[in-house]
């Protein structure tokens, strides 16, 4: 809660006039508790889980009906009906209601402990972006090791096998997981803000962006126009799809966001080998077609 009764008091305390965004933030949050602001994450996660994968539903239905977008489908032999995707969404919402939502309600003391602030001044764009980069890097590294644990025999059989029920991922399957996996993967997500605490708005943005990234990674489509193609060392849908395609025995492509951990620790060899093999097959096919096209019958 902002400790100022008026905008004028806040301006005097800061030694300057509030920006337009700071004034809007003051008007909205001044009388609200930090706990109430933190619980906004429940609404944001619900909207992300519900709306962000929705365009992929229409893409999948259009592809199944007419072949449109087929060239971008990573596993084109796998088709999902509307009922298949709605069932996945219902399962995710059940987990959201029973686990994710209650976890948000009871985890506020951890936010107090790491001192996520909600007052003024608001963070600058540079501050927010730098913190988000740090959060993604920390989450990626810690998630890598948690994910490797999930692919131990015990971790997979008892927990992670649920997430791998979708060998060809779809957007709604990104948060589809065992309740224990949801809880354990909250640790890597929380590590960044714990190490470099910022503003509540930055925290909201981090939680939303991380889930949006997971949905893109599980989209099942490799769109060449995706802006994530320009992010250095970004894995993306094609990279993570291989992990699901191989299945429970996969010891490759554990990274959640970037590819550097898999490269450093040698857990991308199967993926690199398959990719190189497919490129050789395509090249051989092109040469064969070119050769056959150049042969003229008498």
Swiss-Prot record:
GO cellular component: endoplasmic reticulum; endoplasmic reticulum membrane; membrane
Subcellular location, principal: endoplasmic reticulum
Tissues in which the protein is found: Expressed in rosettes, stems, roots, floral buds, flowers and siliques.
Disruption phenotype: Proembryo abortion in the double mutant lacking both SMO1-1 and ACBP1 associated with altered fatty acids (FAs) and sterols profiles. The double mutant smo1-1 smo1-3 shows no obvious phenotype. The double mutant smo1-1 smo1-2, which accumulates dramatically 4,4-dimethylsterols, is embryo lethal, with embryo exhibiting severe defects, including no cotyledon or shoot apical meristem formation, abnormal division of suspensor cells, and twin embryos, and is associated with altered auxin and cytokinin homeostasis.
Transmembrane feature ranges: 42-62, 96-116, 118-138, 189-209
Biological role stated in the UniProt entry: Acts as a rate-limiting enzyme in the sterol pathway via interaction with ACBP1; sterols serve as lipid modulators for gene expression of homeodomain-leucine zipper IV transcription factors. Together with SMO1-2, involved in the maintenance of sterol composition to balance auxin and cytokinin activities during embryogenesis.
Protein name listed in UniProt: Methylsterol monooxygenase 1-1
Source organism of this protein record: Arabidopsis thaliana (Mouse-ear cress)
Lineage: Eukaryota, Viridiplantae, Streptophyta, Embryophyta, Tracheophyta
């Amino acid at each position: 809660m902002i400790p100022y009764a008026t905008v004028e008091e806040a301006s005097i305390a800061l030694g300057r006039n509030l920006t337009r965004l700071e004034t809007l933030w003051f008007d909205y949050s001044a009388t609200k508790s930090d706990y109430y602001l933190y619980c906004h994450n429940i609404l944001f996660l619900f909207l992300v889980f519900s709306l962000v994968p929705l365009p992929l539903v229409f893409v999948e239905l259009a592809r199944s009906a007419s072949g449109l977008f087929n060239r971008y489908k990573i596993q084109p032999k796998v088709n999902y009906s509307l009922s298949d995707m709605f069932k996945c969404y219902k399962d995710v919402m059940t987990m959201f209601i029973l686990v994710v939502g209650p976890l948000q309600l009871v985890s506020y003391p951890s936010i107090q402990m790491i001192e996520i602030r909600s007052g003024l001044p608001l963070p600058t764009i540079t501050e927010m972006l730098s913190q988000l980069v740090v959060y993604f890097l920390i989450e990626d590294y810690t998630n890598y090791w948690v994910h490797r644990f999930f692919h131990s025999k015990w971790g997979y059989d008892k927990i992670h096998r649920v997430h791998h029920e979708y060998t060809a991922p779809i957007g709604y399957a990104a948060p589809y997981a065992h309740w224990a996996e949801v809880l354990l993967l909250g640790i890597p997500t929380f590590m960044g803000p714990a190490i470099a605490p910022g503003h509540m708005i930055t925290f909201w943005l981090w939680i939303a962006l991380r889930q949006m990234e997971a949905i893109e990674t599980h989209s099942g489509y490799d769109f060449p126009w995706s802006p994530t193609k320009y992010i250095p060392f970004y894995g993306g849908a094609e990279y993570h799809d291989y992990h699901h395609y191989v299945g429970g025995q996969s010891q490759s492509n554990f990274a959640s966001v970037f590819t550097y951990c898999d490269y450093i620790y040698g857990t991308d060899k199967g993926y690199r080998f398959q990719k190189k093999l497919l490129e050789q097959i395509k090249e051989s096919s092109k040469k064969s077609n070119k050769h056959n096209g150049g042969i003229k019958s008498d």
